[in-house]
Every structure is written in structure tokens, then in C-alpha cells.
Amino acid sequence: MRPRVQTAAAWPRVCIESVTPSVDNGRFPVKRTVGDRICVEADAFCDGHDRIAVAVLWRPADAKTWASAPMRALGNDRWRAEFPLERIGTYEFRVEGWRDVFATLHADLEKKRAASTVLPVDVQEAVAVVQAAHARSEGALATQLQDILTRIGAQSEPLQQLAIVLEPDTAQAMALADDKPFRSEYPVTFRVESERRAAHFSSWYELFPRSQSGDGQRHGTFDDVIGRLAHIRAMNFDVLYMPPIHPIGAKNRKGRNNAVTAQDGEPGSPYAIGAADGGHTEVHAELGGLEGFRRLIQAARAHGLEVALDFAIQCAPDHPWLQEHKDWFTWRADGSIPYAENPPKKYQDIVNVDFYASGAVPDLWNTLRDAVLFWVNEGVTLFRVDNPHTKPFPFWEWLIADVRGRRPDVVFLSEAFTRPKMMYRLAKCGFSQSYTYFTWRNHKHELREYIEELNDGVPRECFRPHFFVNTPDINPLFLQTSGRNGHLIRAALATTLSGLWGMYQGFELCEATPLAPGKEEYLDSEKYQLRAWPERAPGDIVDEITRFNQLRRMHPELQSHLGTRFYQAHNDQVLYFGKFLDAGYLSRSRSMVLVAINLDPQAGQDAEVEIPLWELGLPDHASVAVEDLWDGHRFTWHGKTQHIRLEATRPFALWRIRAGEVA
């Protein structure tokens, strides 16, 4: 179909392209933290040689009016501006541009004045532009422009009049009076999720409350957990995370070490949710019931800890929903219901809901949302979601938006060990954080490639990696064979590479006994039985974990995976990288954190490393002040190349380097 001339004439003359930050061209919000400044960039240009103006407009999504800030030209038609995130919740921003008539006129007249080629008609036309601006202005701006015109009229010489036209005050007033001819706007309104600090920086400690009595034969309670809080906080953790705390099904209950049949008295898996006592909004009686949970919430707050709960959308075969809401499930022709599988794993004690069963929409969806809100009302605002990749993306996008629309302080952690694109899609759908492949990245090139992937493109804008060193389901092979040194290596990697890290109880004790050689499961897994954990043990790494968490709090560079750059260490067993907040902070502070980690748990390693003096604006022969962050020792490095040695028993080093100082 041929366009009409009138239609074509209305098409934008000012072109706006390649707006960032963006996820799928605005289909999903980018993620940031309250207090951040959003750096918006766009390509913008117009035909011919006329000047253009470009602006970013932003607001909290629930606000009626837009704030605006001019974007500055970076060169090659790229423009940039920033705006602050002053509260949590959703923000919106747009980019607009227009032909800047006065800026074009101003630039032309400056050139003519410099070349002494100004004609009287040039001044007349300039004054006419100011007069037109005055005619469409009101209030104080109209008064200011009238004063400018009066001053111009008081001058008889064109060059004297021109001098007033070219004054900075005139340019400022004309910018305010601009009627934005040929204004165009990028056709997408972009969104930003401004989340609280815990969404991007926190340290998680996971435990099973039933294993906290100190006696492997007595079921623990929330009050027993309260007795552990001081120790957990003393290790400088921020979050206490517990697996499901709901009634556990009796039907098809699993036994010790995942035995298909439980023996009398065995507690079963807490992931087999639901029994005669209730389901997702009830508390397992032996833990102390809801009142016990409320005591734990209050005690945790008093210790400066936040409690995270597991949200697992699955049911034991005797969950009340199977009787009360049969139309939420898929049944076989013989009236049975299939148990859950995640090949090669089989979960005979669990059945799954069907999100699109005949009675599921909207009842099941609303019920699950209400279960989350129930625990939010009980003081829980951190949720670790079990296997979200096996549930529909539309469900998560709806549920998270609904919950955060009511309570924007709620944070969701995705426990999805699946394909990268699925993990990133869950982040796009609203998950604040995600488990990652870190657990299986052990070699230098693997770690570097993975961190660089997370620092680029879509993952950078919406995917916050949570580096768990172990989980109740994952006893990494590396830890099984590397002892205390290996546990130190993984702790060092997790705490320095990501702002989010976590560990499951026993890691600090270097417990890594496998169910069988080559298996990632733990022997005597407390998913199926009670355990008794001491606070300390010979050869533990409690002190080191405490120090790592302390350093993370002290040094903002360690509070995000963003701003990680890898540098040259001439040894494949030494991972060496730098951390900084952003390029602007780096140029202002001329300071950064450097980290080196020996990846070999069996032997010490030496390496020649390159100190990134260029990052601080220094030549290769410069000197920098160095502080060893682990022990506080201060010294000076002279020149770009330095020799380091990392022992197997202390396989890491952290330094802060500063330009302009010598120790």
C-alpha cells in the first residue's frame, strides 16, 4: 500500500533508536536497587545540520506527572542522562527529541560573529525567534523574556543586540520556552524495578529447623532455631533461610537416604507438603506451630536477621487440595495421579498441580498468590521458589507483579537449575535473584566466561546471580575431594564474585560426605532425616566465613557481580580480578579492590600478575598504595607486574589499591 504524502510528512524527522537500559525493547523491566541512578542512553539525530534537543522523562509508575532532564551529547549521535531511584517500586521512563531552533540559531550566529559576517537581517531573525517564544510564554518566564527583549530594544547597534541574544541567560530562558518543533518520542515506555538492597546484596544461611535440637533423635523446633541465631549473626549473615515448614504428608513418605518407603518414626521430606493438618498456610506441629514461627520472626529481627521461606508449589498425595480441589490436578484414566519427576530424580512422595486444569484458572492461581500473601502478613518478605521453571511463565509474571504491586519490598529467589534462556526468562518475569551454574564452574576459564556472560547484555539488566556453594540437593564433587582447602576456595569465589551468596549448614564444618562416590547427594541427607550440627568443629572455616562476610559489608565493590573485570595472571590455577562500582566511581576514587584465588586445593601457586594501573589513570611504572584487606597490612607496589603466591591453606588474597598514595 502506498503511503499518502500527508501521512509521510507526519513521520518523525528526529530519529530515536537503541534506547538503554532495556530488556527485550521494554517488554520487561530492568532491575536496579533503590538509591541507584539510572543511566539512560539513546541514539538521536535529525536530517540536515540543525541542532536537536533530547530529554529523558521519568516517574514512579503510580505518579501522575513526569520529571524531565536534558540528555547530553556523547558524540556519534549518542545521548545520555541520569535519574535517581528514590523509593522502591516500579519506575517508568521515556525518551523524546525535537529540533532545537534556538540552539541551531545560536550556533550559526556564534560562527558568524567569530568570522565577522553577521548581517543586520541575521539579528532581526534572531530577535523574532525570541519574540515568538515570549508570545507563547506565561508567568515568570514571560517576564524574563520580556526583560531580554527590552534590553535588546534599548540597543541601537545590531552587534550589541546580538550579544544579548547570545547570553547564557537568554539560552536558558529560550530552552524553557521551547515549543519543541518536530517533536518525536521513542514508541516504548520503559520500566525499572527499583528493589530494596537485599535484592542485590545479602548473605544467606540455610538450615533445617528440625535439625537444630542438638540431638539427632529429637525433632527440633523454632525455639531451637532461636538458640542458633546469635551464632549465625556472629558469622555476619543477613538471611536465615529454611526449607518448607508445612505439614509433611504421610502417604508415600520417603525414608532415610531417599528410601522409597519410610520406617516408623521417620520424618519424611519437608518438600512433600500437606497432610491432614493442612497445607501451604499451615505450620508443621512438631516445629512449634504458627506461634513458634512468630517467635522466631521476632527473635531474628532482634538479631538483625531476615527470615526467608521456601515456596514450593507441590503437594504430598494427602494434601487437602487433592480432595477439596480435584479439578486442580491431572488424573489418569484409572483414577490415580502421577508422582513428580525431574529425570533422573523421582519424587514418589510428591504430586504436581496442573495450572491449566479445568478448575485451576483463576482459583488455583489466586490460592497460590494468597498463600504468599499469608506469609508476607506474617513478616516474611524473602521467598526462595522451588523449581519455578517447571511452572508456567505467565503464572510467575502475574503472581510476582500482583504481590509486589501490594508489597514492593517482597523479594523472590528463583531456584531454577535449567537452560540459560529459561533462567533469564524467569528473571524477566520478575524474579529478583536466581541460583546459577556457579556450583559447577571450577576452572579459571569457566568462571571467567560465566561472570562475563552475567555482566553483559540481557543478564546484566535483569538477572542477579545468587552463588550458593552447596544446597541440600547438591554436594559438589569438587568439595567432596578437596577438604578444607576446597571449601575455602569456593567460599572465596562466592563471596567476592557476587553480591549474593549462600551456604547450607555443614559447609562451614567442611562436611561433604557423599551418598556414594560420584554422586552429588549428601550421605544421611537431612531432607529425609534429623541431624545434629555442632556450631564449631576441628578444621572448620567459621572464622574465614565470618571475615569474608565482614569484608563484603565494608567494601561496596564486593556487593555486586557487576563491575568485575578479569586481569592477567600467568597461571591457569590463579583467578585474578578487580572489582569497582562503576566507571565514574573508579575515576573519582582512583581506588579499587583486587582479588586473587588459588583454584588448586592440593598445592600453593605462584603467579606474575598485572596490576591494572591503567584503570586508575596511571602509567605502567607508577606506584600505588596497597592494603591487604584480610590482615590490614599496608605496603606499596611499584610498577605494573607483581609476583604473588597463594598457599593451598590460604588460597586467596584481597587488596585495595589507591592511586596518589604511597604507604
UniProtKB/Swiss-Prot annotation:
EC number: 2.4.99.16
Catalytic activity field: alpha-maltose 1-phosphate + [(1->4)-alpha-D-glucosyl](n) = [(1->4)-alpha-D-glucosyl](n+2) + phosphate
Gene3D superfamilies noted in UniProt: Glycosidases, Golgi alpha-mannosidase II, Immunoglobulins, Phosphotransferase system, lactose/cellobiose-type IIA subunit
Any one GO biological process: oligosaccharide catabolic process
Top-level taxon of origin: Bacteria
A Pfam family recorded for this sequence: GlgE_dom_N_S
Oligomeric and partner information: Homodimer.
Family the entry assigns: Belongs to the glycosyl hydrolase 13 family. GlgE subfamily.
Record's protein name: Alpha-1,4-glucan:maltose-1-phosphate maltosyltransferase
